Amino acid sequence: MALIQTSLIWVAYAVAVAILFLIASTFVYVYQKPRDRAAAVTIVCIFTTLALLATVLLIPVDVALVSSTSRSSLGRKKDWATPDKVDSIVYTLRIVYYTLYSLDAVLCLLVIPFTYFWYEEYDQDAAEHGEQTAAQRIGGALKWTLGFLIFVVAIFLVGFFVPFAKQAKEDKRLDLDYFKHLLSENHGERALSFGLGFLITVGTVLFVLYTGAGMALLPVAMIKSAPSVSAPTLAANTASQLETNRERQRQLEGRNEGREGGLDSRDRRELEALVREERTLIRRERLAAESSGEDRHWIVKAWIKTEAFFRPLKLIGGLILLVFALVIFASMLITGIDKAKNSICGAHCGYILGHINIFQPLNWVLVKSAKVFPIDYVLFLLLVLFLFSASVVGIATAGIRFLWVTIFKIRKGQTSPQALLMATVLLTLITLAINYSVAMVVAPQYATWGPQTYCDMKTNSLDEQPDCAEHKDLIKPCSELATNPAAQQVCTPSVLSTFINRVTINFPFFGIVLFWAQFAFLGVYLIVFLTTLFKAPTLDQEQIDRDLEEEEDEGLLASTGRRFGAAWSDVTGRATKPANYGATERDERIQ
């Protein structure tokens, strides 16, 4: 029975990873620029996105496996859950966590930088003339990657050793053996804890800025946005206008053919205006083709059809996401206040909370649903995907910046390979921060103990399990503050919570920064949310979809189609009756 239950949990995780693969592929194909697509960049971005999402979605598996060793209805261990069996489950989870975290670090710090520099090293002219070989390109990429890696390792070593250097100097132990001992302590777990804490802290800064803004923008943008004219109708109207424009140009040129001095001033001005309009219409024609998925990957076409089909439900979906975002905001605020007020050790250990003192809605829902796996897994998947989508929206809105300078812009169908790689790095770091935030702030009881309970009765011996079958009122949720020895025998904390607590206890600075950054996240969310309520959202997703050129005239891309008509045209791929918008009365008379 235990093997079947454990196997089902891992099967559910495998199914979730398969779903994540589709989501990661869709994300990459929707945002990348088709004309600049590179197979290596696409594969690296998809695999990295899959790995980082799989890391976060290991939390419900962790909770389900450690919780499967006990009966929450009786507050006691199951008969098969011997200490050796429990240790085996925890050891397996620890290996999976180490593997995924190491994979995320290698992808973020080694593979993506190499791919970025490899793409940057490409010189089309030199390659066409045989002056640049694959070996030269790889050598240049390796050189830059090695330099970047040395820089990162230097920061890591300085950050790791400096806090201990002062104490070692006072104790007169400032030698090489002492620092070797620090690195190898607990088989290197202390060094790994520092590395994980460092990456989470960097990711938290991005989490505050991008995810905080994106969580406010995403629902409001969905509510306020209206679908533009459908892509098929836009293409049909543009073709009609383009034909009229060119016919008028031919008439002007034919009327003045052979005329001494060429066109008169009035006709010349009109012809120049027609030429400018023709260029704009050609851009719009190409834009309509790309928006409808022409010559795009089948994943992009499927995404466009799905988006168009559900477009009329955007308002309802936006309202649901708005409520969900507010619940997350309230849950994080409640936990933050609870930790600041009732933490068992305060800043010395990163504000670890012994047990929930204030009712927290999201944590309560996840704990209750965890009793029937995989309901909690589905809810947790939706939570993670919402925060991930909010991060994408935040990055798409602000772009990739250094201070006030925009380095890259992230747009659907218009993102360069370099920008896509940089965005993937940011999302990797943000996802590590989401890992901390979900486990320690959004749902701390769920992520630490799940639905585990213990029987708070005294027993005659330490090896005997108390029986609360007749005393249900003595069954209590597992807590770090439990004093009954039975709690230590029954309650098994999740592996992730152990990792994070080790980081915040060994390196209190990380714990302080990570905890107070959650309030900064709430502040950014509140500011952006209130701003978008009284002002048009800065992110217009439909406009971004159609913004092919920076100099595109805004008037030519106005939303003129009907809401449901545009959606149905995009689904069927057929245009409604073309409208002669943009044509002048004079053009109509000439026709």
Curated annotation (Swiss-Prot):
Transmembrane segments: 8-28, 39-59, 95-115, 144-164, 198-218, 315-335, 378-398, 422-442, 509-529
GO molecular function, one term: cobalamin binding
First-listed, main subcellular location of the protein, grouped into a coarse class: membrane
Localization annotation: Lysosome membrane
GO BP annotation list: protein localization to vacuole
Pfam families (alphabetical): LMBR1 (PF04791)
Protein keywords: Cobalamin, Cobalt, Lysosome, Membrane, Transmembrane, Transmembrane helix, Transport
Membrane topology, record value: Multi-pass membrane protein
InterPro entries given in the database record: LMBD1_LysCbl_Transport (IPR050854), LMBR1-like_membr_prot (IPR006876)
Biased composition (Basic and acidic residues): 244-266
Region (Disordered): 238-266
A GO-annotated cellular component: vacuolar membrane
Family: Belongs to the LIMR family. LMBRD1 subfamily.
Function: Probable lysosomal cobalamin transporter. Required to export cobalamin from lysosomes allowing its conversion to cofactors.
Name of the molecule in the record: Probable lysosomal cobalamin transporter
Originating organism: Pyrenophora tritici-repentis (strain Pt-1C-BFP) (Wheat tan spot fungus)
